[in-house]
Curated annotation (Swiss-Prot):
Belongs to the thymidine kinase family. Pfam families: TK (PF00265). InterPro entries: P-loop_NTPase, Thymidine_kinase, Thymidine_kinase_CS. The keyword Zinc applies. Gene3D superfamilies: 3.30.60.20, P-loop containing nucleotide triphosphate hydrolases. GO terms for biological process: DNA biosynthetic process; thymidine metabolic process. This is Thymidine kinase. Substrate binds at residues 117, 161-165. It catalyses: thymidine + ATP = dTMP + ADP + H(+).
Length: 185
């Protein structure tokens, strides 16, 4: 059917938008599931998805995993499949999974960061763009000047590219503030 991407920096509302879209389809009696990578520790338990604002959605069909393609048959019963924090999944696994299911009539809604704190794109997003029907890029609010923020800046531990954290570790910033303040240690 189709693949939709929701992307942007930290605190731009990607998970919130994913939850909103899935909820709309659930109201239309569609069979929906949300997948999150098992590395994501924002979840209270296996049946609750929570965003950085603390908004929770209880979801009977919520799956945490680190590998997608070997579980593809599990998703036959679902019409709408949401994937949160896609940057944590292996990019080839994610692409094959999304493309296969979309080609078999499923709507896939993928949410993930547009880039790491060095402004390097995540392969999962880059590889999804050519096979997607819809891309939504969200913005946050700059932590310094309160203008629109399109980048994520890491406060410390800058030698570790993938590190799970919240506002204790990452902040959204605009281009100017990224360039002026990217030496925070």
């Amino acid at each position: 059917m189709s693949i939709e991407i929701i992307t942007g920096p930290m605190y731009s509302g990607k998970t919130t938008e994913l939850i909103r879209r899935i909820t709309r389809y659930k109201l239309c009696k569609k069979n929906c599931v949300i997948i999150s990578h098992s590395i994501d520790n924002r979840h209270d338990d296996d049946n609750i998805l929570i965003n950085h604002d603390g908004f929770k959605i209880s979801h009977d069909d919520f799956i945490k995993t680190n590998i997608l393609i070997n579980k593809i048959k599990i998703f036959d019963k679902y019409e709408i499949i949401g994937i949160d924090e896609c940057q944590f999944f292996d990019s080839n696994d994610l692409i094959i999974f999304c493309d296969t299911l979309a080609n078999n009539g499923k709507k896939i809604i993928v949410a993930g960061l547009n880039s790491d704190f060095n402004k390097n794109p995540f392969k999962s997003i880059i590889k999804l763009i050519p096979i997607s029907e819809k891309i939504t890029k969200l913005q946050s609010i700059c932590n310094f000047c309160y203008n629109d923020a399109t980048f994520t800046m890491k406060k410390f531990n800058k030698d570790i590219i993938i590190e799970i954290g919240g506002s204790d570790l990452y902040i959204p910033v605009c281009r100017i503030c990224y360039n002026e303040n990217n030496t925070i240690n």
